Each structure stands twice: as C-alpha cells, then as structure tokens.
C-alpha cells in the first residue's frame, strides 16, 4: 500500500511539474484560465498536439510544452474565436469553454522551427525588458517555435573578455556598439557606433538573458547562442600582437578585424569567449 501511495504521489508531482509552463501561459492570457483546461503530456517521436474533451473541460495534449502551447493557440483561435496578436497577448475567455466535439490532431515532421536574425534584435528588440520578452517567448511557444536565436548579452561577454585581455573601459566602449546597432556589430560590420553603453546596461543585459534562457528552457525551446566568427577589435594587432586581417570599411564604417592563422589564439580565443 505504501509503495502504491508513493508511486501515485510521484506521478502527481510529474503531472504538476509538466503542466506548470502551460499553466503560467494560460494565466498570463486570462487569469483563472488554467482551471478550464486539462493539460496532458505524452511521449512521442513526432511533434503533435490533440484537442479533446473530458466532461466540461477542454483537453490539450501534446508531446512537449511547445506542442501543447501551439494546441492552446489553435483552440483559442478556431474554437473560442480568440485571436491573440503580437501586440495583444491577453483575452477574456468564455465562462464555459466551447466543447471539442471530437478529437482533433495535428502533427509536423519539421523538427526545427527557427526564429529571428541579428537585425531583428536591433530593429525591434534593442530596448525590450523582461515583461516584453516574456510575452515574446509565450508567442514563440504558441506558434510552435523551438529554435530561436538568443543573442541578448553578447555585449556582456565581449565586455568581460576584453577586460580579461587588458582593454580599458574606454577602449571597450570604442568597440562595442550601442543597443540599436549591435546587430551590425555582431555581424562584423562596424565598431562602437551608437555607444558608449553605461555600466548599468551590462548588468541589466546579463540578468535579462538569464531570465530569457530560463523561460525558453522551461518550455523546451532550444536557444541558439552565438558562436565565434574570428572577430576582434580593429586594433588587436597593435594591442594584443595578434595576426589579423583588415576587412576595410562597410558603408563607411570601420569594421572589426579578423583573426588569421597561424596563431594559437585562433583556437584559444573562441573557447575563452564561449566559456564566458
């Protein structure tokens, strides 16, 4: 009897834990909405969601949280007549949800659903706070995104790395671009434009990226973190004695330099940056 009770308690704990990201999503859409749904996660090698009915509650079933969230969006749109928009992520659900008359299933063989590019982060997201990012991550899940680019805080990594390499704050500020231009900086097109950034900026960005990654991983979304392209400050040869090439100007902007082989730094610096 004790064994059976223990198993039941463990199963209940798993169910509660599995449902929590979706519960949070539903509560952000409409307070109290999570009590109107039954959320079920089942194992499957195929990404899918199902809509079903149990008594007066709508069942949304899927193989992972992103699939289930996509099912939530499908139900709201096609059964409840609710259209969530990019600028309107809340709604008032009916007191009694429209029933699902027969089980409906949707699946995809598209394993990876990618989102964003570097320009998006500067055009649109440069000054987003956590409140706005929380909505965006919900939006991703509702639309089946599971592989978004996640570059918030790349400037923090570079700030820390260059500090370790002996660069002064003024020198670092001449290299790292301002928020609205970091997309082009990270694509090796310019240095320092739109800066300098205040010290508080880097602290905020580090905290924000940790919040973003935590929420993405709660959903099962896999963030795409930036790798290392060989970019270094334009003065890395004089400042650090590195073997670099000068790519010239981009639309009149001075570009960062590129590390060139042979140099032991070409293998050590990427590891150093990624670990930061």
Model-derived regions, located:
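Short, structured interface segments
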Residues: 72, 79-100
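Acidic, contiguous N-terminal accessory segments
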Residues: 9, 16-69, 74, 95-104
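Aromatic-lined carbohydrate-binding surfaces of glycoside hydrolases
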Residues: 41-45, 54-65, 79-80, 90-91, ...
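Composition- and surface-driven signal marking solvent-exposed, interaction-prone regions
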Residues: 4-6, 74, 227
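Sec-dependent N-terminal signal peptides
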Residues: 3-13
């Amino acid at each position: 009897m004790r064994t059976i009770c223990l198993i039941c308690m463990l199963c209940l704990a798993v169910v509660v834990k599995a449902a929590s990201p979706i519960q949070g999503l539903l509560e952000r859409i409409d307070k109290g909405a999570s009590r109107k749904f039954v959320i079920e996660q089942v194992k499957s090698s195929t990404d899918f969601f199902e809509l079903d009915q149990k008594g007066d509650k709508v069942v949304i079933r899927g193989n992972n949280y992103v699939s289930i969230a996509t099912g939530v969006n499908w139900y709201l749109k096609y059964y409840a007549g609710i259209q969530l928009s990019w600028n309107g992520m809340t709604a008032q659900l009916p007191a009694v949800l429209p029933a699902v008359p027969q089980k409906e299933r949707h699946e995809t063989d598209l394993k990876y659903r990618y989102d964003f590019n570097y320009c998006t982060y500067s055009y649109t997201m440069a000054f987003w706070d956590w409140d706005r990012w929380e909505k965006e991550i919900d939006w991703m899940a509702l639309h089946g995104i599971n592989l978004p680019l996640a570059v918030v805080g790349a400037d923090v990594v570079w700030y820390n790395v260059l500090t370790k390499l002996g660069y002064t704050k003024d020198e670092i500020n001449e290299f790292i671009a301002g928020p609205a231009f970091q997309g082009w900086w990270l694509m090796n097109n310019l240095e320092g434009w739109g800066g300098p950034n205040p010290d508080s900026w880097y602290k905020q960005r580090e905290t924000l990226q940790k919040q973003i990654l935590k929420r993405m991983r709660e959903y099962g979304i896999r963030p795409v973190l930036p790798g290392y392209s060989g970019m270094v400050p334009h003065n890395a040869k004089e400042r650090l004695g590195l073997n670099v090439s000068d790519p010239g100007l981009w639309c009149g902007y001075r570009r960062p330099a590129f590390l060139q082989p042979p140099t032991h730094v070409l293998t050590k610096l990427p590891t150093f940056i990624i670990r930061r």
